[in-house]
Amino acid sequence: MAQPVWAGVDAGKADHYCMVINDDAQRLLSQRVANDEAALLELIAAVTTLADGGEVTWAIDLNAGGAALLIALLIAAGQRLLYIPGRTVHHAAGSYRGEGKTDAKDAAIIADQARMRHDLQPLRAGDDIAVELRILTSRRSDLVADRTRAIEPNARPAAGILSALERAFDYNKSRAALILLTGYQTPDALRSAGGARVAAFLRKRKARNADTVAATALQAANAQHSIVPGQQLAATVVARLAKEVMALDTEIGDTDAMIEERFRRHRHAEIILSMPGFGVILGAEFLAATGGDMAAFASADRLAGVAGLAPVPRDSGRISGNLKRPRRYDRRLLRACYLSALVSIRTDPSSRTYYDRKRTEGKRHTQAVLALARRRLNVLWAMLRDHAVYHPATTTAAA
């Protein structure tokens, strides 16, 4: 006999645990299944058989990562799939009997929550370009973090060896200074080589302003004649770090090129780029965070809630109208919206006017930028809904 069933999946990397319940919360299936296509297809078939023609609702606590294969198979099979964040499962577990925590219990809680709740977000087939952008932007973030970790230790040993050279160059921005460190790290080495040889070394490696950089380096070297303890070992470390940073710069550039190529192929690229403050990277991060499909967000308010730009009430008793920042939101989406708003203040007069107005109202800088980001998100959502590019507001002077 046909019956509706709910299948809760506690997802993992190597395997998943599935619990299937009926309308009375009776357990029909409890099974651990390997994260393998054949095993997952068998599980889907088994759950479908249990329903015997009734509606099957799947719920899972991951929307990417180890659950990607199962999600793809369920969507391809036309199954209804809901997403329950792990934080929600954790808090819901407190309302169930017992303090124990097992994969089976988590899967049962996920299935039961899917059975009772009607506000869970369905998972849809991802936009291929948005999925690729999510991978690339995540990789870019890792590379930038690696570069930051490398450049900071690079500065500290260099400061101990040649503090004057450290003050003369910004290694975070000057590629020529990094090239210099791959060949010369100590005052003695710079003085022995001389300005002409150092400049030739830089020109051979296509450094910009080679003569100026060489002259600055020699001036710094002539200002320090003392030998610092551990100087030779520190010089070796500095040279390796400089090469590492340069290699990371190359990889970041290659990643940026791949991001731009894919982003410009997306149907929303032209619309997003027309919005002041959005460039290729921030636009790609926006698409990666939203999935590239505004149909998933019924309104601009819903999108703002996901981005963490919609304040939530914290009322209790006689206290009302107490609005706070939400705790659960997409950090990547908020970052893209916040940074684009920050850029638009410098490039767009209307954004600057709105920001200044919020500042005169007593808002702090961060609060004013967040308010601007919320306003811009409303506009961007409407633009994507109507497939219209941004047109600055124009005013007509009175005659």
Swiss-Prot record:
Q: Which InterPro entries match?
A: Transp_IS110-like_N (IPR002525), Transpos_IS110 (IPR047650), Transposase_20 (IPR003346)
An example of a GO molecular function for this protein is:
DNA binding
Q: What GO biological process terms are annotated to this protein in UniProt? A: DNA transposition
Keywords from UniProt, A to Z, are:
Transposable element
Give a yes or no for keyword Signal in this entry.
no
| Alphabetical list of Pfam families matching this protein | DEDD_Tnp_IS110, Transposase_20
Signal peptide coordinates: none
Entry superkingdom: Bacteria
Q: PANTHER family under this entry?
A: PUTATIVE TRANSPOSASE FOR IS117-RELATED (PTHR33055:SF3), TRANSPOSASE FOR INSERTION SEQUENCE ELEMENT IS1111A (PTHR33055)
Query: What family name appears in the similarity comment?
Result: Belongs to the transposase IS1111A/IS1328/IS1533 family.
Q: What is this protein called in UniProt?
A: Insertion element IS900 uncharacterized 42 kDa protein
Q: Which organism is it from?
A: Mycobacterium paratuberculosis
